């Protein structure tokens, strides 16, 4: 990650409105990963990441920041919900499976990168195999005779036709590696055992091939993947993935507030304090056994987030609070924020609906006053009922464009037809009554 914090924030601004404090915190944390890797070895091992706790109501951008960060980081990343895990010894997934899933994500990410590197070689090898199936390979000897020369010319002709796609629908018989896939169902918490069994069965069937009749287009795709897989060095891939997890891994733990013990609640709760205590060694730094080998979690960055409606950050066990030293508060959205969300981000909601309906030949145009009124209604409904943040806009837009979306396929629309204008009057006529009536808005919006 060679992007500066300012560049990271600028990139996040393309998709997320407001929440500058949270963006700055994650940008600095991400840049610190790069800074650490520039240090001498003896100092590098001493520098641990400063984990982050994001606090804010639902629908203000906590999860979206994590999603966008994952794309920017180009590093092993996993998002989990704290509520999915149970204390060790109970039925359910234990927290160590987070690191096992992170290891899987690292292998997938690095394999994709390696396949891109060997793509051209794989395409050449796949092309030769398809040509071998279409006609016998040309043999060029010391005393080449005209028949062999013409054979070579035929091969070149077929190669040209193959590249131009003229042979795509031709059926050929080709030897393909036999995939040995075994579906194994197991109770929650036993994923590691099922993975090991699946790997065992896959290794047993390795090297077996079977003859299949396929169209050239399908065969070329399968053979290309097969050849790319052969060119990737699995041992080297695992070593790189292990280093990527340990040095650059990022874990985003959502809904951390749901495992906080609320002030006056008593009794034992399996999914709460026990999960927090299991998370402690993971965040502090421990060793977890994965398919890559033993993974040290000392330098994995953990970002936790929660709405904290019914509990407070201080309800988390003190040790966990200490392991999340950077606190960032995300603010509730204002009507102006809703207005910007509808119009400013790359691939905003209004742009998505406009392009979706354009596929039917229907043009819609969102007027500034219509967007402003829509933002006001979203804010009002959130204030009167449950505040679900920007997610309210999805509900309102679906309701607003329901009739248009339903009948768009039946309308014979001429290319020169004027666009449907979504202005303040249109918004009021479709949503005004629902927004004013609190009982209706509770159930419909």
UniProtKB/Swiss-Prot annotation:
<keyword id="KW-0547">Nucleotide-binding</keyword>
<dbReference type="GO" id="GO:0036402">
    <property type="term" value="F:proteasome-activating activity"/>
</dbReference>
<dbReference type="InterPro" id="IPR003959">
    <property type="entry name" value="ATPase_AAA_core"/>
</dbReference>
<comment type="function">
    <text>ATPase subunit of a proteasome-like degradation complex; this subunit has chaperone activity. The binding of ATP and its subsequent hydrolysis by HslU are essential for unfolding of protein substrates subsequently hydrolyzed by HslV. HslU recognizes the N-terminal part of its protein substrates and unfolds these before they are guided to HslV for hydrolysis.</text>
</comment>
<feature type="binding site">
    <location>
        <begin position="59"/>
        <end position="64"/>
    </location>
    <ligand>
        <name>ATP</name>
    </ligand>
</feature>
<dbReference type="GO" id="GO:0016887">
    <property type="term" value="F:ATP hydrolysis activity"/>
</dbReference>
<dbReference type="Pfam" id="PF07724">
    <property type="entry name" value="AAA_2"/>
</dbReference>
<dbReference type="Pfam" id="PF00004">
    <property type="entry name" value="AAA"/>
</dbReference>
<dbReference type="GO" id="GO:0008233">
    <property type="term" value="F:peptidase activity"/>
</dbReference>
<keyword id="KW-0963">Cytoplasm</keyword>
<dbReference type="InterPro" id="IPR004491">
    <property type="entry name" value="HslU"/>
</dbReference>
<dbReference type="GO" id="GO:0005524">
    <property type="term" value="F:ATP binding"/>
</dbReference>
<comment type="similarity">
    <text>Belongs to the ClpX chaperone family. HslU subfamily.</text>
</comment>
<dbReference type="InterPro" id="IPR027417">
    <property type="entry name" value="P-loop_NTPase"/>
</dbReference>
<keyword id="KW-0143">Chaperone</keyword>
<dbReference type="GO" id="GO:0051603">
    <property type="term" value="P:proteolysis involved in protein catabolic process"/>
</dbReference>
<dbReference type="InterPro" id="IPR003593">
    <property type="entry name" value="AAA+_ATPase"/>
</dbReference>
<feature type="binding site">
    <location>
        <position position="391"/>
    </location>
    <ligand>
        <name>ATP</name>
    </ligand>
</feature>
<dbReference type="GO" id="GO:0043335">
    <property type="term" value="P:protein unfolding"/>
</dbReference>
<dbReference type="InterPro" id="IPR019489">
    <property type="entry name" value="Clp_ATPase_C"/>
</dbReference>
<comment type="subunit">
    <text>A double ring-shaped homohexamer of HslV is capped on each side by a ring-shaped HslU homohexamer. The assembly of the HslU/HslV complex is dependent on binding of ATP.</text>
</comment>
<feature type="binding site">
    <location>
        <position position="319"/>
    </location>
    <ligand>
        <name>ATP</name>
    </ligand>
</feature>
<feature type="binding site">
    <location>
        <position position="17"/>
    </location>
    <ligand>
        <name>ATP</name>
    </ligand>
</feature>
<feature type="binding site">
    <location>
        <position position="254"/>
    </location>
    <ligand>
        <name>ATP</name>
    </ligand>
</feature>
<keyword id="KW-0067">ATP-binding</keyword>
<keyword id="KW-0346">Stress response</keyword>
<dbReference type="InterPro" id="IPR050052">
    <property type="entry name" value="ATP-dep_Clp_protease_ClpX"/>
</dbReference>
<protein>
    <recommendedName>
        <fullName>ATP-dependent protease ATPase subunit HslU</fullName>
    </recommendedName>
</protein>
<dbReference type="GO" id="GO:0009376">
    <property type="term" value="C:HslUV protease complex"/>
</dbReference>
